[in-house]
């Protein structure tokens, strides 16, 4: 919100088990979720955007839907000329399908590329995902893809695609906070009034590298060591994909906007 107006509509997100359904119910749920996002994006473009440049930002299931949105609504339309960039974080983009998904949208390879896709999936150093497969959307429809195949990635500390280890002393990692919040908030269909905020993590500092085989973003250092001590943590930093890089991400948004205009 330092560089942009934010449009963040709610949508009917598919449940976690939609990704494991052996019938079509899971894919139908994901199609329904996507339809909300496409409708919201159309409303934004037609009523709120006023022909200005825009950024698409999404994480996890949201990133999966953003792949589809960019393919259908942006990549092959005049809107691509107004796309500053798209941060589609925390969901795999297999390298072999990139050209099918985004034939007219480049992969980012520097801090000030525009009209491009930026993606990463973060894990601790040496971690390999034990979940073998996941659903993936392609223009011809849904497929089941191996999680182990090489994915498109950018290192958010260097904004390059090489496998060097990088740190960013100016980065600030954050943690979500909430007052009077309990588990029922997750189940409520209404806003419960819990006051949510963010704060800086007590420990700062780590470095990261793109794994040359998988494309996963591996991280190590003091903050990562602290996260490893969390109960039930298995080595996948998926819940922290954005929080870890909050400071460098905010700066990069400024850099790409400056480059675009």
Task: Report the location of each language-model feature.
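Active-site catalytic motif of lipid deacylating hydrolases and related acyltransferases
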Residues: 1-53, 218-261
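Structural recognition of the beta-strand scaffold that forms the well-ordered cores
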Residues: 5-10, 55-56, 85-88, 118-119
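Short catalytic/ligand-binding loop motif for oxyanion handling, primarily in non-cytosolic enzymes
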Residues: 15-19, 64-65, 96
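Surface cap/lid and interfacial helix-loop subdomains adjacent to catalytic sites
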Residues: 38-50, 72-225, 259
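Gly/Ala-rich beta-loop-alpha elbow adjacent to hydrolase catalytic centers
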Residues: 58-66
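Short, hydrophobic alpha-helix immediately C-terminal to the catalytic nucleophile
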Residues: 67-71
């Amino acid at each position: 919100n330092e560089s942009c107006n934010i449009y963040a509509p709610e949508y009917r997100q598919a449940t976690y088990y939609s990704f494991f359904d052996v019938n079509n119910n899971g894919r139908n749920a994901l199609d329904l979720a996507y339809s909300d996002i496409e409708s919201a994006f159309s409303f934004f473009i037609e009523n709120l955007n006023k022909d200005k440049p825009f950024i698409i930002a999404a994480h996890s299931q949201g990133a999966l839907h953003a792949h589809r949105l960019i393919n259908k609504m942006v990549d092959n339309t005049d809107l691509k000329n107004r796309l500053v960039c798209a941060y589609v974080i925390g969901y795999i983009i297999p390298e072999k399908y990139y050209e099918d998904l985004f034939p007219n949208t480049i992969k980012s390879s520097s801090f000030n590329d525009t009209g491009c896709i930026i993606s990463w999936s973060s894990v601790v150093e040496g971690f390999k995902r034990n979940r073998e497969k996941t659903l993936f959307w392609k223009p011809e429809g849904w497929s089941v893809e191996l999680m182990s195949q090489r994915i498109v990635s950018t290192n958010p500390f260097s904004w390059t695609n090489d496998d060097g280890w990088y740190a960013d002393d100016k980065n600030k990692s954050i943690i979500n906070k909430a007052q009077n919040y309990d588990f029922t908030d997750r189940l409520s269909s209404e806003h419960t009034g819990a006051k949510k905020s963010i704060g800086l993590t007590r420990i700062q500092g780590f470095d990261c590298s793109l794994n040359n085989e998988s494309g996963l973003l591996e991280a190590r250092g003091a903050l990562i060591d602290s996260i490893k001590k969390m109960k039930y943590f298995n080595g996948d930093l998926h819940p922290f994909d954005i929080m870890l890089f909050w400071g460098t991400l905010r700066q990069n948004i400024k850099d790409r906007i400056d480059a675009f205009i």
